[in-house]
Amino acid sequence: MAGEIPDLIAEARTGTGKGAARQARREGNVPGIVYGGGIDPLAINIPFNVLLKRLKDGRFLSTLFNMKVEGQDDVRVICRNVQRDVVKDLPTHVDFMRLKRTSKIALFIPVEVIGEEECPGLKKGGVLTMVRPEVELRVTAGDIPEQITIDLTGLEIGDTVTISSVELPAGAKATIDRDFVIANLTAPSGLVSAESEEDEDAPAADEVPATEVSEE
């Protein structure tokens, strides 16, 4: 489960629009905006290297931050969008939404897999296919889970893991009502091909196999 909320330090940006944003980038910052919470949006700058490191650390879009801006009250935020340069794939603008610790928000949470060593299907050569490596959950902003876990113990080839078989963290709920598939165990391609060839060689249901008839 989520632990201590990390700080994210930014500075208020004077001026808005494309000109101010370009100036921020020239000075080694990434321009951004903080909105929501029933108060006016706040234009900010975040040091490029700080933001890039956070992005490389992973889970940036599902991490609740305590944003510190000089002259402003600390506020809990979550990133809702990171715009990137289409060529260099580097961040050029970032949007944050203000949240209360008790706010509910929909986030994609990574799926962790355990129990591979106790999975008969994998031991027989089965292949695990992750249909949903991440699952969208509605969670409390102050208690965002790091991942949800699926257990392969005892599963055979042909079995599936659905959301109903997963123990979700307290307060979390899937955003999709139906019992969707997260992963499945399929037969290895070689075995599937062999079975297909056997099916082709077998007589059709409405055919009678030819038999030798002895003449009397």
UniProtKB/Swiss-Prot annotation:
GO terms for biological process: translation. It comes from the Bacteria. One of its GO terms (cellular component) is cytosolic large ribosomal subunit. Keywords: Ribonucleoprotein, Ribosomal protein, RNA-binding, rRNA-binding. This is Large ribosomal subunit protein bL25. Residues 195-204 have a biased composition (Acidic residues). Belongs to the bacterial ribosomal protein bL25 family. CTC subfamily. One of its GO terms (molecular function) is 5S rRNA binding.
